[in-house]
Amino acid sequence: LGDVYKRQPKGWQSLSLAGLPSDGLLISQITEYNNALYVPATNGTLYRSEDGLTWSAVENAPSVKYVLGSVKQGTKQPSALATIVDQEGKLAFYAMNESMEWIAGDAVASGFPVTGFSNLQYAAMYHEYLMTAGGRTADNQVVNTTWATMDGISWALMASGDANFTKREGAMITNYDDKFFLIGGIDASNKALKDMYQSIDYGISWSLIDSMVVLPTDYAARGFSSIIVDKENFVNIFGGKTSTGSNDLNQLWRGRINRLIPKE
């Protein structure tokens, strides 16, 4: 990337939260859906907030173990909050619609990631999709698969195997320059990564990026960062960890491909 530099975050202030337990939250799975935020707890409770500060348990919800993300509304396609539910000891896909009604789906495949995955919303062929990449399965295996859904209750395996990106959790994924970019993460040996892969076919195949688009030498390998592309085509990377047990990094990195600088 061109114009890459590091910032120490400034102008941030601590805010108090209400209604959440002190532990047991899967914060990395916090998801925005239909103008509200949702986050699951390890005991199966799903919490909801309209302002990010005041939270309450979602009433009449099943035992939600994991939140996978949300599917946007399409022309002839309803939106959905995609989750995984504990159904009498077995994991199943469930989706919640805008009316907060729950729809049961398929059983979760043994190779499907439940934690440590990255997710991405995208549109293709007049449909809206949600994709997961990498992560860790319920039986504690780190994977290098991508899965996609249009409804949150049926998921299709998009990519796997040695020709894909290497196995990792906590990678970053974003849609940038008409491609999907997958950056970094932490592998099964707890080694942080800083490699970059790209996909030009909606996550079906991935290739390691050459030296034309690279991260700076003083950018530490990391996983579990947040990534946002802003209106000026800057890629912003927030925080992250250098191992699964390390403290969060207090850093903001941003950069962009020079030819994507907006014209004035």
Annotate the PLM regions.
Residues L1-Y5:
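Short, small-residue-biased leader/transition segments that mark boundaries at the very start
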Residues K6-R7, R48-S49, A95-M96, T149, ...:
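Conserved Ser/Thr-centered positions that define the repeating blades of beta-propeller domains
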Residues Q13-A18, S56-P62, I103-S110, A156-S160, ...:
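Beta-propeller fold detector
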Residues L20-I27, S63-V67, S110-L120, D162-G170, ...:
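Short glycine-/Asp-/Thr-/Trp-enriched loop segments that recur within the blades
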Residues Q29-Y33, L68-Q77, Y122-Y126, I173-T174, ...:
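Structural signature of eukaryotic scaffold interfaces centered on beta-propeller domains
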Residues N35-V39, T75-A82, E128-T132, D178-I183, ...:
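Entry beta-strands of beta-propeller and related beta-repeat scaffolds
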Residues N43, E88-K90, S118, Q141-N144, ...:
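A detector of repeated loop/turn-to-beta-strand junctions in beta-rich toroidal repeat architectures
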Residues R222-E264:
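Blade-level signature of beta-propeller repeat domains, shared across WD40, Kelch, NHL, RCC1
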